[in-house]
Amino acid sequence: MSLKSIAKQALSLMDLTTLNDNDTDEKVVTLCQQGNTLFGTPAAVCVYPRFIPIARKTLKAQGAEQVKIATVTNFPHGNDDIDIAVAETKAAVAYGADEVDVVFPYRALIAGNEQVGFELVKQCKAVCSANNVALKVIIESGELKTAELIRKASEISIKAGADFIKTSTGKVPVNATLESAHIMLETIRDLGVADSVGFKAAGGVKTTEEAEQYLALTAEILGQDWINQAHFRFGASSLLANLLATLNDEQVNQNVTGY
């Protein structure tokens, strides 16, 4: 595939994201407008729950209702209070989210507690299932660090009902890496759940060339045909400008953020 073809594919697989403490309605409106490109739209926009209504209104106004709205819960710290995670997930669904990205209680897993992660994901999944909302589970691979823990968090999340497993919050020093993606994609393959579970690389994917590496890795493990909006996403914000530059034959200036 040409770099332009890859850029266009990556754009269609993006969860175009703003998760900053200084987010405003205006910034979310701008994000939604930026995603409405001459080369198509992203799979989703990802915003804090309180911005779901303005995102919905903006997407509708620009005729981009096919773009899903994702949000985050138990974010970003991945605490182990199941009741709070479930309450936040219920609130996100009530705001109108199409997809919820919940943070797995990764510190509890590092400390040896596998059960709380399973229960938290299972209960959040029950809320989502009842409302036809997809659940993505952020395992925070850069904090888990070891292949063993990354695989374990992926397995627990999948067995508890995750629709996607996602690398990172974008709020820690190490976010998506090809190494962690490799382990997560192999876990999806090895558990035989490729039909029902997807993968999301989030944080740190900033260029068309980097996106290409993730797409190539995924194709190698799960096949080219597996790569579609139902199975694969990039969680990103600064990636969009680079993809558009590739598509427009322009040079791009890198703006550096965690996402």
From Swiss-Prot:
Q: Which GO terms describe its cellular component?
A: cytoplasm
Give the main location. Answer: cytoplasm
What GO MF annotations does this protein's record show? deoxyribose-phosphate aldolase activity
* Superkingdom of the organism of origin: Bacteria
Enzyme class, top EC level, equals: lyase
CDD domains found in the cross-reference section: DeoC
GO biological process terms held by the UniProt record: 2-deoxyribose 1-phosphate catabolic process; carbohydrate catabolic process; deoxyribonucleotide catabolic process
Please give the Pfam families that the UniProt record associates with this protein: DeoC
E.C. numbers: 4.1.2.4
Q: Where is the active site?
A: 101 (proton donor/acceptor), 166 (schiff-base intermediate with acetaldehyde), 200 (proton donor/acceptor)
What does this protein's UniProt record list under function?
Catalyzes a reversible aldol reaction between acetaldehyde and D-glyceraldehyde 3-phosphate to generate 2-deoxy-D-ribose 5-phosphate.
Q: What is this protein called?
A: Deoxyribose-phosphate aldolase
